[in-house]
Amino acid sequence: MNYTMLKGKIHRAVVKQADLNYVGSITVDTKLLEAAGILEYEMVQIVDVENGNRFETYTIAGEPGSGMICLNGAAARQVAVGDHVILMCYAQMTPEEAKEHHPKVVFVDDENKIARVTNYEKHGKLTEDFI
């Protein structure tokens, strides 16, 4: 039996654009994808912090260092520009792999620049000094 484990996460990124007429997906700054260990075209789950919407799409690599987070196609209806979103990617692992696994968690500032990268996910309240 395999487990589905959190592989990578970009926490509280700010939606910069929403393009309803694009074919689909989410465009993400390449630096953020790399820091979180998420590949271009990989499936991600997205949670909108402001409205609670939760949906899946795939990633498209955006310009490195741009801070771009753009929801495309139908996904653009799930968010508003300025909303905070959490992007999560999962991987299948054997029980042995799962026991040793630590996800890559990327915290960003309001410009979607990397503020901190950790290899753990723990319960707790976000504070300014945590990010």
From Swiss-Prot:
Location of the protein in the cell: Cytoplasm
Q: What catalytic reaction does the record list?
A: L-aspartate + H(+) = beta-alanine + CO2
InterPro entries in the record, alphabetically? Asp_de-COase-like_dom_sf (IPR009010), Asp_decarbox (IPR003190)
Q: Name one GO cellular component term.
A: cytosol
Q: Which UniProt keywords apply?
A: Autocatalytic cleavage, Cytoplasm, Decarboxylase, Lyase, Pantothenate biosynthesis, Pyruvate, Schiff base, Zymogen
The pathway is:
Cofactor biosynthesis; (R)-pantothenate biosynthesis; beta-alanine from L-aspartate: step 1/1
Q: Which residues carry this modification: Pyruvic acid (Ser)?
A: S25
Which of the seven top EC classes does this enzyme belong to? lyase
Family annotation (CDD domains): Asp_decarbox (cd06919)
Cofactors demanded by this protein: pyruvate
Query: Where's the active site on this chain?
Result: S25, Y58
How and how many cofactors are bound, per the record note? Binds 1 pyruvoyl group covalently per subunit.
Q: What is its EC number?
A: 4.1.1.11
Question: From the Swiss-Prot or TrEMBL record, what is one GO molecular function term?
Answer: aspartate 1-decarboxylase activity
What is a biological process (GO) this protein takes part in? Answer: alanine biosynthetic process
* UniProt cross-references to Pfam families, sorted A to Z: Asp_decarbox
What PTM annotation applies here?
Is synthesized initially as an inactive proenzyme, which is activated by self-cleavage at a specific serine bond to produce a beta-subunit with a hydroxyl group at its C-terminus and an alpha-subunit with a pyruvoyl group at its N-terminus.
Residues annotated for substrate binding in this entry: T57, G73, A74, A75
The leader peptide range reads none
Complexes and interactors: Heterooctamer of four alpha and four beta subunits.
Functional note: Catalyzes the pyruvoyl-dependent decarboxylation of aspartate to produce beta-alanine.
Family per UniProt? Answer: Belongs to the PanD family.
Output the NCBIfam families linked to this UniProt entry.
Answer: panD (TIGR00223)
Protein name from the UniProt record: Aspartate 1-decarboxylase
What species was this sequence derived from?
Agathobacter rectalis (strain ATCC 33656 / DSM 3377 / JCM 17463 / KCTC 5835 / VPI 0990)
Query: Source gene?
Result: panD
